[in-house]
Amino acid sequence: MLELKQISKRFGDKQILSDFNLLVPEKQIVAIVGPSGGGKTTLLRMLAGLETIDSGQIVYNGENLPLDALEKRNLLGFVFQDFQLFPHLSVMENLILSPIKTMNMTKEEASKKAMSLLERLGLEQHADAYPFSLSGGQKQRVALARAMMIDPEIIGYDEPTSALDPELRLEVEKLILQNRELGMTQIVVTHDIPFAEAIADVLLKVESK
């Protein structure tokens, strides 16, 4: 279980989050909905160690986590809104780059793990493909596989249905629900309330500041 207590974050004069509290039960989907400016994406970025946390407390399974070491903790694997796949790298190369550089995996170890994830997500035939040749749904799954390469405790999705047509939106919904059946803990931030209601065990609404 993940518990956030009185988390605060400010960018310059703008208060993004103020004494924010959140409880994320293990193996469940927590959806956070609300308009832009409510701090949803910033929250995910902080949990992934991509932004600093000004103040507050993070407790995971009873352990107080240092706020300045979340990136090394691999607490959250981040699936970016725009996927952020490297266009000059193949699917396989996108997946193995970070584990080799940051986790001291050998190329053989990383490639084996990546192929296992691609098979699980139905992408094994696209291992040598480049991002430009993939559909939106396929890119989403590659981004998920990349997030899973670091063995995170939690997967976080930033606006996973943004700019997707209804068919691909349903595909993403099924993928997230399948991951719950596999025991994954997931946080989804979105402005798409019907989508959030379809997937969430816990639904939290935030307002813009």
Q: Residue spans of the language-model regions?
A:
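Conserved ABC transporter NBD signature motif
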Residues: 56-64
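Conserved ABC ATPase signature
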Residues: 130-134, 138
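Helix-to-loop junction immediately C-terminal to a conserved catalytic motif
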Residues: 48
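Conserved ABC ATPase "signature" region
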Residues: 107-125
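Catalytic Walker B motif of ABC-type/P-loop ATPase nucleotide-binding domains
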Residues: 155-158
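A short, proline-enriched helix->beta-strand linker immediately N-terminal to the Walker B motif
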Residues: 149-153
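ABC ATPase NBD coupling module
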Residues: 64-77, 181
